Amino acid sequence: MFANSARNALKKRPQNLQPFRFQGCLFSKRANRPLTTKVQHLIYASVDDKALVTLFDQPRSTLRSPFATTGLFGHPSLTHPRALISLADATVVRAQLLTDRILRARESRTELLRVVKNLDRLSDMLCGVIDLAELVRNAHPDRSWVDAANRAYETLCEFMNVLNTHVGLYEVLKAVLSDPSIVKTLGPEAHQTALIFWRDFEKSAIDLPAEQRKKFVSLSSDILVLGRQFLEGANAPRPPASIKPSQLSGLKDKGMGVRLQLQAQFTQRDLQVYPGSLQAQMIMRSAPEEEPRRQVYLAANSSTPQQIEVLEKLLRTRAELARLVGRDSFAHMTLDDKMAKTPDNVWNFLDALMDHTKPFARRALHTLSERKQLHHGTSSLPIIQAWDRDFYCPPDPPAPPIPLPPLTLGTVFMGLSRLFQHMYGISLRPADSASGEVWHTDVQKLEVVDQDQGIIGWIYADLFARRGKASGAAHYTVRCSRRTDDDDESSDGTVEGAELLIYESQEFEAVKRHRLPNQDGIYQLPLVVLLCEFARPTPSKGPTVLEWHEVLTLFHEMGHAMHSMIGRTEYQNVAGTRCATDFVEFPSILMEHFLNSPTVLSLFDVDGTSTVRHIGNHHNDPCHFIDTYSQILLAAVDQVYHSPAVLDPTFDSTAELAKVHNTRGLIPYVPGTSFQTQFGHLYGYGATYYSYLLDRAIASRVWRNVFLDDPLDRETGEKFKCEVLRFGGGKDPWKMVSALLDVPELSTGDAEAMREIGRWKINSEIGVHGRH
């Protein structure tokens, strides 16, 4: 509950999104399909839309007002690193006052009625600084700011850890939820917020005797330490494969192949090829002989006994923690508040998805087997081994469905703004930033503008690669939405001698508050940061031209951003992307599907006057189904690893991995391999790795059934906005999906609902792994 920032950073994961809650070489068919759409109803690019092109494509510094001076994100106090540490201290003082107020709530019915509101305020008070510090830790180029952010983060997390197991807070919330007369006064958002706090308290062993709570804290600390060790091992280099030069004859890649041969002749030794290197990738895709590919595969999937021991100890400790709080397994404990609800329901989904995907994957493997037979000249179809996949079906980079001119970063942002105007009546507008407001000259500030309500939030775009910046793509929620005019903060009290600190914290929060037209109350508006690592535009090379996978990434991250902007709830604990782990990726994956529409792609045309009339170069890649099936198997392994089985003294993670592959897989397990020690999601997504598959299935169905025929239809966009995005995490995701698809049977979210989603086709045209 009070154990980390919100869904702070929705990050690109190599295979590690850490969710926070306040706590082709096949016989591939290129279908020449006519994609003819007369574009007559497009909204032309506005002055603001065209300004986005200039903003991102011109190699100049951030737009700044020459007169204004402020601190980070417009907070006047945050002009130097020490101020961040001071703000953390001030926040602790105010948070303690609010905690004391909540603890006294049973003295007054009026205060009991305010408990849920005050718990949410307490959460926001702490997360508002923690989330900002988390961004600074990952993006600020100045080491002194990073150090200050680390100190602030640690100070507030330490305080949060106290709140997590605070029996008094739990007892007050219990009194509220046990009183029907109070519960019936709670609106849907308030009730959902209360339940989130309640569940998180329960997961923290709050109702156990003191000795068991102490044990819970100890096990939780052990899990953090083991998790760090596991991730270090997962990212550690694997030992090289020793390849004989004679085994590399006939390499398809002549350039690197010749270099390797010359290297071997010069050294008079076998080649040492490190997994993950360009040489290793070249061998896996280009070596006609099987043996070097096999050797590289074995090396790439090797583990030390210590790495396996760390993982198994992590899994056992999680299971012990779950047993301590009365749950059968870590999966049972984790899935309570997810769409899936139970491990059985996850298996219902995975089994159905396997059954649906297996025929397509078998067909693809049969084609690979035919190619292998032709290659080796055998009389019978050979078995496809794990090291054959990339040789007989080398991965193709993602490509647009129709030929497109080079897409610059500014052009893509213009297209996004025009898309949001069609769908939601919302646009993006460049904004000046004051001196001191941003952490690097690369950072550009965008206003998110609703046609009826004006500015509804801000996006700070930090999109170019630089030294010291976090790698990958990420969406950081620095500030969540929350209603503030009914805070009644004057009743929080004060502390003699701490008036200046209290004022400092209050001023920090006051900057966030705004009154919107046509909406009751005053709200703090959402503020998000997009981090990417695109190439920087230069005067000599011109603007940044994005690869197609980078366009997909940007659409994905902007899906998260619009969820944050539109999900402006009264309670920050359910705002925007603060929703169930197995639902949060749905809006962002859906955004990728829009790139399959020629009509949407026409929005990249600045004049908006062209007729979309192209022959599509749509590429049906059969190997997609092999990859999807492999991901399903990993989700199955994740469930096994977080089941009661891990407490069996004979539990062996490698044996269980082999069992899943040999009983449910299509490609045989390779003895001597232990990929599980590199499966980083086992820590960040323990027991919930199925989530991305679930959201891909939902997004594919919503695209086909809701948006495909007319993706720019405003009525359809409004339906998605009103049935899904605006609720954030304040409504049952099953009810949202049910209403959006007009399928009432899904609303129960039961075992059959999970099976039904498992039977839906996952679109093969999008969903590049690793984008979150």
Curated annotation (Swiss-Prot):
Its main location: mitochondrion. Binds 1 zinc ion. It catalyses: Release of an N-terminal octapeptide as second stage of processing of some proteins imported into the mitochondrion. Pfam families: Peptidase_M3. GO terms for biological process: peptide metabolic process; protein processing involved in protein targeting to mitochondrion. It is found in: Mitochondrion matrix. Transmembrane segments: none annotated. PROSITE patterns: ZINC_PROTEASE. GO terms for cellular component: mitochondrial matrix. Residues 1-42 form a transit peptide. GO terms for molecular function: metal ion binding; metalloendopeptidase activity. It comes from the Eukaryota. Zn(2+) binds at residues 556, 560, 563. PANTHER family: MITOCHONDRIAL INTERMEDIATE PEPTIDASE, PROTEASE M3 THIMET OLIGOPEPTIDASE-RELATED. Belongs to the peptidase M3 family. Cleaves proteins, imported into the mitochondrion, to their mature size. While most mitochondrial precursor proteins are processed to the mature form in one step by mitochondrial processing peptidase (MPP), the sequential cleavage by MIP of an octapeptide after initial processing by MPP is a required step for a subgroup of nuclear-encoded precursor proteins destined for the matrix or the inner membrane. This is Mitochondrial intermediate peptidase. It comes from Laccaria bicolor (strain S238N-H82 / ATCC MYA-4686). The lineage of its organism: Eukaryota, Fungi, Dikarya, Basidiomycota, Agaricomycotina. The gene is OCT1.
